């Protein structure tokens, strides 16, 4: 628990970090938040980059993984592989509502062609478990592998932002896909197995597909292009449902 939440001047901090590299941003986070620093992962296409980069600096950092219960088999195997290789301090969180129970109550929300259904799905399967993780782990700050090129919302981010009660820190914010590839190669790290199938981003099995001609963004391959964000990386307010609508996964 201990320790007070730092009161950061975000403009000053982001100006300072604008000259820093990704490792230096992680080191800054570790020094600024000696307690209550976590990271999140989706075990997605490029997740090995952040997992390796952060754990080289903070080996025992709690790594939060939201298991929706709908991930592809390959993702579960990839998670095991990376967890063992990097000796991750993995904290797995799931919705208290099982997939079968959710479908009985609400139907297959991902098949309902409206944002409200997708937002309900995301809240049940992703947002509520993440909020619980932040609370139970007494998180003050959260390292995430968001990059400016991924969604409209992410273009607006700084290296450090405030989301709800926590600070959010984005060490690879300005990295390009080429930077990611070069880091993976330099450290002999794996892509998710679906990369070889043409996927540039992967989430739940029912809402991800390979990149196709005509896609304007890699996030168009998720939720049939209707949403870009899942809600985990959008501001958490009392109007959660409405805020999820603003830029969704």
UniProtKB/Swiss-Prot annotation:
TM region positions: none
Active site: 230
Pfam families: PAPS_reduct
Taxonomy, superkingdom: Bacteria
EC number: 1.8.4.8
GO biological process, any: sulfate assimilation, phosphoadenylyl sulfate reduction by phosphoadenylyl-sulfate reductase (thioredoxin)
Keywords: Cytoplasm, Oxidoreductase
GO cellular component: cytoplasm
Catalytic activity, reaction form: [thioredoxin]-disulfide + sulfite + adenosine 3',5'-bisphosphate + 2 H(+) = [thioredoxin]-dithiol + 3'-phosphoadenylyl sulfate
Record pathway: Sulfur metabolism; hydrogen sulfide biosynthesis; sulfite from sulfate: step 3/3
Compartment list: Cytoplasm
InterPro entries registered for this protein in UniProt: PAPS/APS_Rdtase, PAPS_reduct_dom, PAPS_reductase_CysH, Rossmann-like_a/b/a_fold
A GO molecular-function annotation: phosphoadenylyl-sulfate reductase (thioredoxin) activity
Keyword Manganese: no
Primary subcellular site in the record, as a coarse category: cytoplasm
EC main group: oxidoreductase
Family, per entry: Belongs to the PAPS reductase family. CysH subfamily.
Function: Catalyzes the formation of sulfite from phosphoadenosine 5'-phosphosulfate (PAPS) using thioredoxin as an electron donor.
PANTHER family reported in the protein's UniProt record: PHOSPHOADENOSINE PHOSPHOSULFATE REDUCTASE
Name of the protein described by the UniProt record: Phosphoadenosine 5'-phosphosulfate reductase
